[in-house]
Design a protein with these regions (language model features):
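Conserved hydrophobic helix-helix packing surfaces used for dimerization/oligomerization
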Residues: 29-32, 109, 216
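Short, flexible loop/turn elements at secondary-structure junctions
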Residues: 34-36, 90-92, 110-115, 135-136, ...
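Conserved catalytic alpha/beta cores of large enzymes that bind or transform nucleotide phosphates
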Residues: 20-36, 43, 309-363
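Phosphate-binding site of ATP-dependent enzymes
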Residues: 193-215, 222-316
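Conserved metal-phosphate-binding beta-hairpin within the catalytic cores
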Residues: 1-2, 219, 266, 278-287, ...
Length: 363
């Protein structure tokens, strides 16, 4: 949340207030559990900004760390002049059924940790407090393909409702399991799926008069951080990976082995900011769009992953906060473009709720 434009702070606070009232109306104390970073200044500033938004709602917010070296309150200096205090987590109450800090027993626990490496023992068996999001939303069980399957359903229904081709808002994708890049197993599946997807994309390009070379993105089905990603324009490319490319694709966040991949239609990044390829990122709290920013990378092209060295963020005052179109202006005028981004973000959030509901049923 460090890239959220300050102009949208009131909207963010209102959205956070709405979310908290639904989850824990009597909440006074909230515990924020971040990722295990102490050196990533951008991430720590994000945690501080998120805590500030929550404090503006009237909550007492403290930050509990899972890091074993945090054994006492530890204050970190941030690059913007602020400080952030991390405190050691501890189990509270009879039988340790609650999670909190020394002299701090929260109503709710907000995870800003994606649980890529699994659920730590400290977070297990919490039956008396709200954990937001629930543990089964972590990347130890979550898969990108399940999210996009749910998004496909939502986008299809929405497109039928307003009379557009769902392909305009729903990129094609396929999945391959049983992959081992080091041992070169699963290459046949990967090659076939890349070939199939490129064929379908070419057909859609012809149908829509798009004069571009189609491409797909091969990415790890689990995990975040822009790891394990490659751009492919021909199926032969995935058969002829050199050792360096295989090593890059084989491991994701927390050093976990990549065994499942998603092959996703590549969408050319046509926007630029200060001569850099730029893609919009939309912030949401609860069901509200609260602003956004551009991820910019001057070292990457329109068909590449921008989450890579050379990346920077441009917090932009998205006109009207992505919530109001302007019918007097052209369809691609900034207020209307940002409104369209906000619509897709809300569809994606609805898809995430469906994905989460299904994971609860399956757990």
């Amino acid at each position: 949340f460090n890239n959220l434009n300050p102009a949208f702070l009131p909207l963010s606070v209102h959205a956070a207030q709405t979310a908290i009232e639904k989850i824990c109306p009597e909440a006074k104390n909230l515990l924020l559990v971040p990722e295990n970073h102490t050196r990533n200044q951008f991430y720590l500033t994000n945690v501080a900004r998120l805590a500030a938004i929550l404090r503006h709602t009237g909550l007492n917010v403290r930050i509990g760390s899972l890091l074993p070296e945090i054994t006492a309150p530890t204050t970190l200096d941030l690059s913007d002049g602020q400080t952030l205090t991390l405190e050691p987590l501890k189990r509270l109450g009879p039988g340790g059924r609650r999670l909190g800090l020394e002299d701090f027993d929260p109503c709710a626990i907000l995870l800003n940790n994606d649980l890529s490496a699994g659920v730590p023992d400290m977070l297990k068996n919490l039956h008396e407090q709200f954990v937001i999001p629930p543990l089964q939303a972590g990347w130890h069980v979550r898969r990108k393909s399940r999210h996009f399957a749910a998004y496909h359903e939502v986008a299809l229904a929405f497109a039928q409702e307003i009379g557009i081709d769902p392909w305009l808002i729903d990129p094609e994708f396929e999945v391959c399991g049983q992959i081992n890049f080091h041992e070169r197993t699963g290459e046949e599946c990967l090659t076939a799926q890349v070939d199939t997807l490129l064929y379908r994309i070419r057909a859609k390009y012809r149908e829509n008069g798009i004069d571009r070379e189609p491409f797909v993105i091969v990415k790890a089905d689990a995990g975040t951080y822009g790891m394990g990603i490659m751009t492919v324009k021909d199926a032969s490319e995935v058969k002829d990976l050199n050792r360096r490319q295989r090593n890059k694709m084989a491991v994701g966040k927390e050093g976990l082995l990549v065994t499942e991949v998603m092959i996703q239609e590549g969408v050319p990044t046509v926007e630029t900011v200060a001569a850099g390829t730029a893609e919009p990122v939309v912030y949401m709290i609860d069901r509200y769009v609260v602003g956004g920013f551009y991820r910019v990378n001057t070292q990457r092209g329109i068909d590449e992953n921008l989450n890579a060295p050379g990346m920077r963020f441009e917090p932009l005052a998205f006109d009207t906060g992505c919530t109001l179109p302007d019918q007097a202006q052209a369809p691609d005028a900034p207020p209307n473009r940002f409104y369209a981004y906000g619509v897709v973000a809300r569809l994606a959030l609805l898809a995430a709720s469906i994905e989460l509901e299904r994971s609860e049923i399956g757990s």
